[in-house]
Amino acid sequence: MDSDSERASLESIKDNSECVHVSNEPNLTATCVDSSVGEEGVTDVNSSAAVSELVPPEQGEGALLNSVPEISERGIPVDVVSSVDGGGEENAAFNIQEIDSVGGDAAAVEEVPLKSSSVVGEGREEEAGASIVKEEDFVAEANLSGDRLEENKEVSMEEEPSSHELSVCEVNGVDSLNDEENREVGEQIVCGSMGGEEIESDLESKKEKVDVIEEETTAQAASLVNAIEIPDDKEVACVAGFTEISSQDKGLDESGNGFLDEEPVKELQIGEGAKDLTDGDAKEGVDVTEDEMDIQVLKKSKEEEKVDSTTELEIETMRLEVHDVATEMSDKTVISSAVVTQFTGETSNDKETVMDDVKEDVDKDSEAGKSLDIHVPEATEEVDTDVNYGVGIEKEGDGVGGAEEAGQTVDLEEIREENQELSKELAQVDETKISEMSEVTETMIKDEDQEKDDNMTDLAEDVENHRDSSVADIEEGREDHEDMGVTETQKETVLGKVDRTKIAEVSEETDTRIEDEDQEKDDEMTDVAEDVKTHGDSSVADIEEGRESQEEMTETQEDSVMADEEPEEVEEENKSAGGKRKRGRNTKTVKGTGKKKEEDVCFMCFDGGDLVLCDRRGCTKAYHPSCVDRDEAFFQTKGKWNCGWHLCSKCEKTATYLCYTCMFSLCKGCAKDAVFFCIRGNKGLCETCMETVKLIERKQQEKEPAQLDFNDKTSWEYLFKDYWIDLKTQLSLSPEELDQAKRPLKGHETNASKQGTASETDYVTDGGSDSDSSPKKRKTRSRSKSGSAEKILSSGDKNLSDETMEWASKELLDLVVHMRRGDRSFLPMLEVQTLLLAYIKRYNLRDPRRKSQVICDSRLQNLFGKSHVGHFEMLNLLDSHFLKKEQNQADDIQGDIVDTEEPNHVDVDENLDHPVKSGKDKKRKTRKKNVRKGRQSNLDDFAAVDMHNINLIYLRRSLVEDLLEDSTAFEEKVASAFVRLRISGNQKQDLYRLVQVVGTSKAPEPYKVGKKTTDYVLEILNLDKTEVISIDIISNQDFTEDECKRLKQSIKCGLINRLTVGDIQEKAIALQEVRVKNLLEAEILRFSHLRDRASDMGRRKEYPYLLKLSNSLTMLTLRECVEKLQLLKSPEERQRRLEEIPEIHADPKMDPDCESEDEDEKEEKEKEKQLRPRSSSFNRRGRDPISPRKGGFSSNESWTGTSNYSNTSANRELSRSYSGRGSTGRGDYLGSSDDKVSDSMWTSAREREVQPSLGSEKPRSVSIPETPARSSRAIAPPELSPRIASEISMAPPAVVSQPVPKSNDSEKIWHYKDPSGKVQGPFSMAQLRKWNNTGYFPAKLEIWKANESPLDSVLLTDALAGLFQKQTQAVDNSYMKAQVAAFSGQSSQSEPNLGFAARIAPTTIEIPRNSQDTWSQGGSLPSPTPNQITTPTAKRRNFESRWSPTKPSPQSANQSMNYSVAQSGQSQTSRIDIPVVVNSAGALQPQTYPIPTPDPINVSVNHSATLHSPTPAGGKQSWGSMQTDHGGSNTPSSQNNSTSYGTPSPSVLPSQSQPGFPPSDSWKVAVPSQPNAQAQAQWGMNMVNNNQNSAQPQAPANQNSSWGQGTVNPNMGWVGPAQTGVNVNWGGSSVPSTVQGITHSGWVAPVQGQTQAYPNPGWGPTGHPQSQSQSQVQAQAGTTGSGWMQPGQGIQSGNSNQNWGTQNQTAIPSGGSGGNQAGYWGNQQQSQNGDSGYGWNRQSGGQQNNFKGQRVCKFFRENGHCRKGASCNYLHN
């Protein structure tokens, strides 16, 4: 390209002199050179970095300058001579002096004339003029965009990653259209060659552009954030990073008239580099990068120096021209300076202002100087190195240039000399500036902010990375940035870094706090759960309060995190939270809203510092985190935090009374027993604070200066006094108010002056809320004290001062002796406290940082057990060291906790693991009084069977495992001890029994027991038999009181030998070692857990815990936990317990000859209950320890060891379903002492109840034998129903031959023999009944009177039923003389074992008793077709499914509820006429019919006794005795509301072979004579086949005979005649049907003959059709098939629920509807009728002659249910 074309090119762009066309080629680094110029270079004398670079402009490369100021060389003056190859267009040399901007000097440009030198390029010489540009020239042309800086930097690094030498285009990322054109031709054009005549116009245009740039800078910067191309010069300037470009370096064109605008671009590049300060990765390795780049540039400079030399003439010419240009540009300097001021906030000419600002910034960031201290010496070394490099470059510049070098040697040498001079000057200036800077920097190091260090580091990196500008540009750009941009850039960078640092710190703190708070919340919730379990007696309100507190804490924590996320707001609050009384650092309120006026001192130590506020609304209290055992991270997490001032210091409930000056607070309940003085409302002073305040008010410290010095500013007392004075001023409290302070709820004796002297009140009693006690954790030792106790203590202690008896603990006495020089006499509490404070002051034990804390020396550490103790805590802990005080307390709770000196608490420690007793232990009080230190003398007395005694010889599995370690003594130690064995069953709760170990044996193979392996097995006495069990199945838990009581009953019954005091004591001593070890470990574990939990939750030492100690929940503080732990771990305590001889409780009542007063009292009460007309005592809870709900023993299991607990719940349900009016609806066990069998009982209330229902006095009829209670959960016995209107009347006296001998139940005349063969007794019948009902006797237990021999014994079941003769002679003896309400289902309270037989009148015949147990001795009851059970209760269904279909044998207790005649062996041949006539209305008419007698062997009803049946008009006839509840209740005790049919025996039933019934006669119920008849009568009285005539062979001894041949379905009523040959049984007959018409109905055994499975067939009368038809028992129209079916008509269909007594004309709801499928027996009401199936007894509807007047229960009528259930005497329909 020739000169014309070049000129034309320059002319074309002179209008926009600032336009710079930059090539973006990666390898092009020259500034605006001709594309054809490739050999011309630049001579560069080193800048502040002492760098002299001569960049060879090889094919696209131009001058590349390296001017990298280090951190320490900010503003170092640099003289630079630059010879720029502009394609022959310009040569420039500059000598610029730069002043450090950090030092505050305004950058100044020193104009140095340079020699004009010619630049050789492509064979032609071109002269260029260099102009010296002022620092401010180009400031206004650029506005740095923060976003663009990062982008520019990234572009720079991309385009020149290896050498970090970037062209202008690469640095700025310019991609304009001109740049693209230049890139295509491979040239870089510098625009701006203008003629000399255009300079003025250009200057004017520059000024205008400066103004425009000022306005458009912001918009341009924003628009260029995301743009890669820079379309015009203004955008280039913005990208370059200069705040203003005030001058240009105009190079001369060929004619010398034009100037090339090159400098703005270069300055822009510098500005960009300087502004790019926010990049974090530019902060490291700055020094290394500079060194590497300097080396690279120096190498290039050496080569360029040889090729590119200029003549001195050219340089001289340029110097003159530059001088002129500089003069012309001076006006622009002013404008640029103004612009600079806009961006930097300082004028470039005001150095002092810059220095002040810098120092002020440095003051704000004191850490910045630290890094400067590091970088300054390094930068100084690098500057020196750069100078040396520059010198070396000049020396080594020869040899480069090839053929063109020869013509320029002279010029290069001159330039080298100048460069050397400049280098020397620069070095000198550098040294001077460095020394000055070092001094300034040393001052700044202490206070300078981190922002400046980061900004200067970024500046150095940017200059280092972007040194592709000319030396002149670098000099001017550096000056501009030092004055204009450095400070601002540093501020921005450092602020950014500080913000990031703060954000990181806040985030880290927040995360830590959130984690801590989450853990804290988890711990607290876990503690709440544990507390709820441990402290079972806590009220629901307490739990709710805890839950609410937790929610409040959560909300507070959330607010806290929100506050932390706004550090500026918190900072503002911190500024406003200060107060005049801060003594520590400025208070920083971590929490709080600032809406309330917070206190500025800690409420616990009264000192200032970093405090946290309580978040409770209206609470102004502040605390040190350490005072509440929290760290600041805890308060930075989510949730609210309420201080412990708002919780009662004793029970942790919401506090009502608050102390003004300490954390002590009380709820209303605790305030009754505590000393608190209310001053205003519910706020006042605790006892401790009141005494301290009184000392302050009365100035008693002047009288006793050694005690409390409230004027010592270093003491805690001074802080307390200061706080009190301020508080009193704020509240305007007067001395009169203090004197009139009242105790809450006790207006008397609250005046402080009435409390007596200071010695009368304990300084720390309740008020020990102290500095270290946390919110909820105050010591509560004083809870059992009163004011009078305090006075007694104070006065009493004075009297004891001369005694030798120790009045305090050893540790406290040591301190007192030390301070009083050997005097051990008694001191009151306050004097001891004063002595302690004097000791602390004498030895200066106050913590200098926290005056409320005391540093414990060895003496205090022994006293308090810790290295630091709070003031209040210390005073409070003294309370535990006063022994006298504890002994004077009424309720010695502390003695239970620390029992070092009191041996009477031994068993308390031993029983710590035992469950809390449900009732009061009367013997426990005497146990404390009668402390025995040696062996007891009453070793032969009978020992009490109570929790304490049995605990001494009770072995848990863990104890047995410990005993296995000594195999030699294992058997000896475990023998005679008790273990707890689980009893299998279907109960929801497992049942356990205490059994005695009688020996050990070896197992065939070893097995695992815990962590041990053994082959030992235990031989235990399980009731009446010995069993072998493995150790691993015994319980590892403590036994319960109920289990202990059951054990006591077993011992009383003789199953286990009675224990004596000597036996238990000997065994307890043998087990003492292992028990003490186990108990100590358990106690240590428990107390350790309490201590750790309290520590984890930050609770203080005075926080009270509830702990189970023996039979009570005891408050235990954390402090006491620690003390207890120390005590338990001490060898002395262990040895003391080992040597202690346990105390054994004696119980004279365990003597068989001693009658229990309690039992007598109960019997008397029970007798009274029997006389009550309601006869509902059976509904009351029994008093026996064995309740059906707790599970007991069936009579069978008590002696056989087999458990039938699966029947208990079912029986309980059955008892409710089947029990009559007198039976319990709660499932109470039979035969609590409420049950009496005496005839007088039966007649007393029962007969009176019956009489109103009887139309006339008629002889009573047959009764049914009652059954002894199968278990304690058996169905309640039937009693006479008040609705007995239709009850069978008595038989004529002529028939009754043998009355029942009366017996007094309370008379002790009965003996029995236990399984060991030992005769026990005498006992009363009431005792025997109770034990039998609780299941301790076998079914065949025989008893005899004291005046008789064992040969005359009778079965207990018979005796309980009233049959005291072993054999009866007649039917009259076999059955009751009076008819029983059994058929009506009335259960008698006095007769627990009555089955269907209700109560007998005194003139009735005897009830034969069967020695067998109840229906199900083995837990299986007879099942009447269990597959068809439709009972509404699942329990009953389940229970019925257990009935055994096994064949009953005469010898086997007749478990099917059949009357077993095999036992009697006697033939009763009397005749019983049952006057049961069913009229057309279904009413019974008293008539008499002969009953043929079958085989006498079967002892059935063979006698033709005539029994009149009183059937009052309107009374519904109900076959009550036929009731067999589906649940198989053993005492059906069903209470049919309608009249019973008496006790019909099967022989009464009309059979085909028995034509003797009149047409109108219905079923005559014959009563079999069965001396051994089972107590539980079954449906048809389980008679033998009495309906057999001579033509019908009789079934042999069929106990299961039933009502004729009626087809049987358990859900049926009386049904029509069964088909012949059908064994109509309940569940089938056990005897094959040998004769047609004979129904061998039985409860259990399967029927060999096919039983008709009619829908709900009941007892169908079988007999001749004509006799059956005569039975007018048709149910009413509308009650299809209900009641007695007409014989001969077959099974009546249509009613699937035949009921027992729908014989009335009144329709009966339950059986009346043909669609009744409910299967209720005996007119049981369906649920829709209001009766949810209380049993068969419920006759629905009908005109029943109730003695209550047939009234309907008003509760049942109004509410649909009656709470009395079956015991109610009114109708429930």
From Swiss-Prot:
Phenotype reported upon loss of the gene: Silencing-deficiency characterized by a lower siRNA accumulation and a transcriptional up-regulation of specific loci that correlates with a local loss of cytosine methylation on DNA and an increased methylation of histone H3 'Lys-4' (e.g. H3K4me2, H3K4me3) and 'Lys-36' (e.g. H3K36me3).
Gene3D superfamilies per the UniProt record, alphabetical: 3.30.1490.40, Plus-3 domain, SWIB/MDM2 domain, Zinc/RING finger domain, C3HC4 (zinc finger)
Segments of this protein annotated with the region Disordered: 145-166, 270-290, 361-409, 434-591, 741-797, 903-935, 1139-1274, 1409-1469, 1485-1605, 1649-1746
Any Pfam family the entry gives: GYF
Chief location: nucleus
Basic residues bias (residue ranges): 578-588, 920-935
Domain comment quoted from the record: The PHD-type zinc finger (599-665) binds to unmethylated histone H3 'Lys-4' (H3K4me0).
GO cellular component, one term: nucleus
Biased composition (Low complexity): 1529-1555, 1585-1602, 1666-1677, 1722-1735
Domain GYF: 1307-1361
Keywords for the protein's UniProt record, in alphabetical order: Coiled coil, DNA-binding, Metal-binding, Nucleus, Phosphoprotein, Repeat, RNA-mediated gene silencing, Transcription, Transcription regulation, Zinc, Zinc-finger
Tissue and organ distribution: Expressed in seedlings, mostly in the vasculature and shoot apices of young seedlings.
Compositionally skewed regions (Basic and acidic residues) per UniProt: 147-156, 273-286, 361-378, 444-455, 497-513, 741-751, 903-919, 1139-1152
Underlying gene: NERD
Keyword Manganese: no
Protein name listed in UniProt: Zinc finger CCCH domain-containing protein 19
Domain named SWIB/MDM2: residues: 801-884
GO terms (BP aspect): gene silencing by siRNA-directed DNA methylation
Self-association state and partner proteins as the record states: Interacts with unmethylated histone H3 and AGO2. The interaction with AGO2 in required to direct DNA methylation and silencing.
Polar residues: bias regions: 752-762, 1193-1212, 1409-1433, 1441-1469, 1499-1509, 1518-1528, 1569-1579, 1678-1708, 1737-1746
Biased composition (Acidic residues): 514-529, 551-572, 1153-1163
Short motif Nuclear localization signal 1, span: 581-588
CDD domains (alphabetical): Bbox1, GYF, PHD5_NSD, SWIB-MDM2_like
Placement of sequence motif Nuclear localization signal 2: 921-928
